[in-house]
């Protein structure tokens, strides 16, 4: 079998950090994988809100946000890579995509251009979105290695967990997709 036919693609999957996660940056996280290929992987942590809200962030980038329900929506820590850059995970846009959008096959869209934020500020943006600062990134083979060492569980992503479940409940909700709860997980890997 060739390498291209036996490799898995985890795009549009949740990565759920196991209790024995070696990197404390990802302890207790759920990551939505936007892209996974032989070159590496890119994802956004969806359950780690920051102290920054949309009103504060929009003010920093000279955008006026006056939509009351959005003012105090938290901005999330998306991962340790490019933490000064915004990444917006949202439902696919009808018609033309935003300037820098990546469509996730079978899933959502991720946009990095300011036009999506301008649309949010004007009330014409995506109805459901999650804004992160930074992203999680893995080089070629790095994520697969972490999974093989029991660092992550994987499960097909459910957009309802991204947008409709409170941040503090997303880890348990993602685990429930696998039929397990957090108390069932151990930091020890089994060996035969």
Curated annotation (Swiss-Prot):
Any one Gene Ontology cellular component term annotated for this protein: cytosol
Name used for this protein in its record: UPF0301 protein Bxeno_A0649
Family as reported in the entry's similarity comment: Belongs to the UPF0301 (AlgH) family.
């Amino acid at each position: 079998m060739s390498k291209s036919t036996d490799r898995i693609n985890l795009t549009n999957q949740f990565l759920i950090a196991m209790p024995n996660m070696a990197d404390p940056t990802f302890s207790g996280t759920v990551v939505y994988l936007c892209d996974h290929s032989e070159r590496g992987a890119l994802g956004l942590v969806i359950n780690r809100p920051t102290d920054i809200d949309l009103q504060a962030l929009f003010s920093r980038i000279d955008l006026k946000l006056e939509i009351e329900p959005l003012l105090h929506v938290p901005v999330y820590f998306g991962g340790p890579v490019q933490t000064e850059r915004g990444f917006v995970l949202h439902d696919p846009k009808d018609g033309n995509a935003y300037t820098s959008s990546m469509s996730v096959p079978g899933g959502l869209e991720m946009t990095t251009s300011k036009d999506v934020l301008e649309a949010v500020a004007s009330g014409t943006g995506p109805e459901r979105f999650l804004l992160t600062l930074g992203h999680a990134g893995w080089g070629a083979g790095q994520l697969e290695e972490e999974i093989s060492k029991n660092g992550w569980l994987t499960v097909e992503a459910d957009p309802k967990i991204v947008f409709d479940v409170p941040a503090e409940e997303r880890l348990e909700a993602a685990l429930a997709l696998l039929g397990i709860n957090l108390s069932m997980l151990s930091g020890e890997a089994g060996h035969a």
